[in-house]
Amino acid sequence: MINLFVLQKGRLAQEQVDDRQELLKHHNPIWIDVVDPEEEELQWIKEAFGVSLPELEDLGDLEASARYFEAEDGHLHIRTDFILDDDENPRNVRVAFVLTDNILFSIHEQDLPVFRLVRLRARLRPGSVRNAKDVLLDLYSTDAEYSADSLEEV
């Protein structure tokens, strides 16, 4: 599933992308969040934006050199674990980010509470997000809050 976000009047507006043509018609997204993608969805992103996202099975490598690096094309690649505080099966979910000049791409296996909260806040508070870097920073600060709350319950 591809969720595409654009800024409208200082707020994040979300659009779900169901096919390649829908993806190609968007010219100014600031965040593209890819959840449990099909192989063809990753290909659409590559064709539309020239960005190769890692496949989910490739996210397992979390050696120091794979956590954060700048590629030859100038894109910043970051891999991070986010807590999923599920009562039955609490666990970490690995997320890969690719930050280009003006778009944040994220890819992960399942939707995360932190991501939902960031989307909600950015829709309700105009001006809280102005660009792709703001989205990334907001994801990390919200993750710190969520992780602290989860650990308090232990």
What is each residue range found by the language model?
Residues 1-154:
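Peripheral, non-transmembrane regulatory/ligand-interaction domains of membrane transport proteins
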